[in-house]
A protein has these predicted regions:
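Surface-exposed interfaces of beta-sheet-rich extracellular modules
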Residues: 459-487
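Short coil/turn motif common to extracellular beta-sandwich-like domains
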Residues: 342-346, 433-434, 455-461
Length: 575
């Protein structure tokens, strides 16, 4: 765009140039780099969204393996008998073939470089792949291609580039830096510690990226979950430091369905950890795929659908854009309330991130109840009693806990209006009240706003408890403001059905752009039941963006990084 920048290379010939910001542009540009009379021209350079994709085999898994998956059946003919997703493979393949804008996509695959005494040898970088069709991507990550297609479409044909740095079978401790590894594994002589960090991340140089994709965990389900938690946070910190963005958004892929005797029962607990980490860490989001995956293939073929969900998550939380098209948008619905009347046989479940929920076709599976936490009884049927509430009856004398979709391989049963399944949960306590709490929820409420209804003639004592970091903001009963004395409100022999709404806000006040956090706990005689609030929106959600369709004239800085024949141009996020 007529820009001219100069800089000085270091003793190894490395340099970094920061260009003035440019809008996303699908028209190929020419970039010329010159030094000492020599000149190198890079043609057909696009300006758009760049992501870093890392992890193990399900991030590295190439399109070629997907295209020729018949070899799986040939190796084990019995495999095809229950391999339903194999039959669906053709439809996924058609989706890749039908995409007409491959010229908008760019892919860079980092080579694994050799090491000598833990020090990376110099190695030549790969070149960017500039595809004309799916046929040019045989050796490119299936996950990267699927995400790039979906994101480009949801952003109305903005160019998308993916930098892939992934190694099949790698464990998370291989991707963290040496200092973090020394803290987590003191005195451990494991030669794989930080191995991928040294030979798969450091050699890339400093690219500018909009966000990161992390598809990893299959090799760590056998290990200690607390160790994984520490390693993930170390990986997150180092990845953000490397890309010079302390709030870099990260999308993680929750392990989908898979069944193998060697890890039987381990995947559900690991999925719970992945969800917990996404909620603990700022600007980290997880894609739930509890209804995806293959029975006996650890490399599922339905990554196109998985990545559609990832792109829908990015659209809402990274770009802050509304979406009215078909397909996934936002995050998976989660159970935010479980209750029953004392002595009653009906249990109610309410969901967040859903305007309405649907039962899947056929017999519903996945939900089970217990009265003693020892033996869980499957719940065979459900009834929709509100836009985002379902109920069920059970023959158990009373229900104290529920768990949902706790399996290695099974059938998910509830979806929201965007086709996203309800996220699995393990041992959620069912609250018991002495009064009837209606399941019906008023429509048109803002995200997370819960309204609890109390039937006429009831007595109740409510305690409202804010989650950590939040303070009380307002209480209303049937739309009228009410006082909250010491966190409690007494309701005696109410003469009509009433709606009780309590709203909290972040301690110290909140921006007008933030959604109100709401009732963290509503209790009769029961103990505290903290509900998960909706994820705080990214700082990008309400900021200007340079992508097409956002209507912003703001120019953000662009960073250019050149390594051998590799080049990336990406929009730098505003702090």
């Amino acid at each position: 765009n007529g820009q001219l920048k100069t800089c000085t290379a270091d003793e190894y010939g490395r340099f970094l140039v920061e260009l003035d910001g440019m809008r996303a542009d699908a028209t190929g540009k020419t970039l010329t780099v010159s030094a000492g009379g020599a000149e190198k021209r890079f043609e057909n350079v696009l300006i758009g969204e760049v992501y870093y994709g890392s992890g193990q085999s399900n991030m590295a898994y190439p399109m070629d393996e997907f295209t020729y998956a018949e070899s799986v059946i040939e190796a084990d003919p019995s495999y095809g008998e229950d391999y339903e997703k194999y039959n669906a493979r053709e439809s996924y393949l058609e989706a890749f073939k039908d995409f007409k804008n491959y010229h908008l996509l760019r892919f860079y695959t980092q080579k694994m470089l050799p090491e000598t005494n833990g020090v990376v040898n110099k190695g030549e970088c790969n070149v960017w792949t500039v595809p004309a069709s799916v046929n040019d991507l045989k050796y490119t990550s299936l996950t990267a291609v699927a995400y790039a297609i979906q994101l480009s479409q949801k952003l109305e044909n903005v160019p998308v580039g993916i930098i892939v740095s992934a190694v099949g079978g790698s464990r998370i401790h291989e991707w963290i830096d040496e200092k973090a590894a020394a803290r987590i594994f003191p005195g451990n002589g494991d030669s794989t510690l930080s191995q991928r960090y040294r030979n798969m991340l450091l050699p890339m140089g400093s690219f500018t990226v909009r966000g990161a994709l992390w598809y990893q965990g299959e090799s760590d389900v056998y290990g200690d979950l607390e160790t994984y938690r520490l390693c993930f946070k170390a990986w997150l910190e180092e990845t953000r430091r490397f890309f010079k963005d302390e709030s870099l958004p990260v999308i993680t892929f929750q392990l989908p369905q898979y069944e193998d005797e060697s890890c039987k029962g381990l995947w559900p607990a690991f999925r719970q950890l992945q969800e917990k980490l996404a909620k603990e860490c700022e600007n980290v989001y997880y894609v739930c795929g509890i209804d995806l995956g293959d029975h006996r293939n650890i490399h599922p073929v339905d990554k196109y659908e998985f990545c559609e969900r990832a792109a829908g998550l990015a659209l809402k939380y990274i770009y802050g854009k509304e979406y009215s098209g078909e397909g996934s948008y936002g995050k998976n619905p989660e159970v935010c309330g479980l209750w029953r009347k004392k002595g009653g046989d009906t249990v109610y479940m309410r969901f967040s991130d859903a305007e309405k929920v649907f039962l899947s076709e056929g017999t519903a599976y996945g939900l089970s109840a217990t009265s003693n936490k020892q033996a869980y009884v499957a719940i065979p049927s459900y009834r929709s009693v509100g836009k985002r509430t379902v109920s069920f009856k059970t023959k158990l004398k009373y229900v104290s806990y529920l768990q949902e979709n706790v399996f290695d391989y099974g059938t998910a049963f509830l979806y929201n209006e965007f086709g996203l399944p309800v996220a699995p949960f393990v041992e959620r306590e069912v609250q018991t009240y002495d009064f009837d709490v209606s399941a019906e929820c008023a429509g048109g409420s803002v995200e997370g706003d819960e309204r609890f209804f109390l039937s006429a003639g009831s007595d109740a004592s409510f305690s409202f408890v804010p989650k950590d970091g939040y303070v009380f903001k307002s209480l209303s009963i049937n739309g009228a403001a009410a006082a909250l004395d010491g966190g409690r409100v007494e309701l005696k022999n109410v003469s009509e059905d009433i709606a009780v709404v309590c709203v909290f806000e972040k301690a110290g006040g909140m921006d007008s752009s933030d959604q109100s956090d709401v009732v963290s706990s509503v209790m009769g005689e029961s103990d505290k039941n903290s509900e998960d609030s909706s994820k705080e929106k990214s700082d990008l959600q309400n900021s200007d963006s340079c992508v097409k369709g956002c209507g912003s004239a703001l120019m953000l800085p662009v960073v250019l990084s050149v390594c051998a024949a590799g080049i990336a141009l990406g929009q730098k996020r505003r702090k």
